Amino acid sequence: MTPVAAASPDYARRINIVQGEHRVEHDPEAVLCTILGSCVAACLWDPGASVGGMNHFLLPGDAHAQAGGGGAAMRYGAYAMELLINDLLRHGARRDRLKAKLFGGACLMKGLTDIGRLNADFAERFLAAEGIEIVGGSLRGERGRRIQFWPVSGRARQTLLAADQPALLRAEPDLRTLRAPPPSGAVELF
């Protein structure tokens, strides 16, 4: 029998990330996985500290009304990003070495507000404002994606889903009813 490499994609320790979650790992055998429609996943890592993480977020339904300004929806997005960044810093990452890959933000339902574009725009603006370099990824479009991210190396793999994905559409929440949580204080920025 031929030995299998520890970081082989078929034998890695897979960790699924669902909407609203984030995860930070320093295990070279870990691979963070998610499925995205209009949601966005930010994959951040520090190559010097061999640590990385992924989040999976969707701006609440009132984001289209607040796209140009602050508001609760943008605070929710900033909170999701800061949770990931702060957790990376707690695990030894340095902010000045962080790299990013962004995925998702698809427009899955024609005729409705393109919440995927708003999610993608937000993620790009946030990282630019934080001075975190975006080195890759795949945003927008009309198809969902399956993402695998190796947090230690920063390697990522994307598989586009078939154009007709009714199961994925059912899994996405009704964007008109999803609302931002009420503000509960300031977000601590490092």
UniProtKB/Swiss-Prot annotation:
Source domain of life: Bacteria
Enzyme class: hydrolase
Record field: catalytic activity: L-glutaminyl-[protein] + H2O = L-glutamyl-[protein] + NH4(+)
A single MF term (Gene Ontology): protein-glutamine glutaminase activity
InterPro entries per record: CheD-like_sf (IPR038592), Chemorcpt_Glu_NH3ase_CheD (IPR005659), Cytotoxic_necrot_fac-like_cat (IPR011324)
E.C. numbers: 3.5.1.44
GO biological process: chemotaxis
Key word Hydrolase present: yes
The keyword Ligase is annotated on this UniProt entry: no
UniProtKB keywords: Chemotaxis, Hydrolase
Pfam families noted in UniProt: CheD
Cysteines engaged in disulfide bonds, as pairs: none
Annotated function: Probably deamidates glutamine residues to glutamate on methyl-accepting chemotaxis receptors (MCPs), playing an important role in chemotaxis.
Record family assignment: Belongs to the CheD family.
Database matches in PANTHER family: CHEMORECEPTOR GLUTAMINE DEAMIDASE CHED 1-RELATED, CHEMORECEPTOR GLUTAMINE DEAMIDASE CHED-RELATED
UniProt-recorded name of the protein: Probable chemoreceptor glutamine deamidase CheD
Organism the protein comes from: Acidiphilium cryptum (strain JF-5)
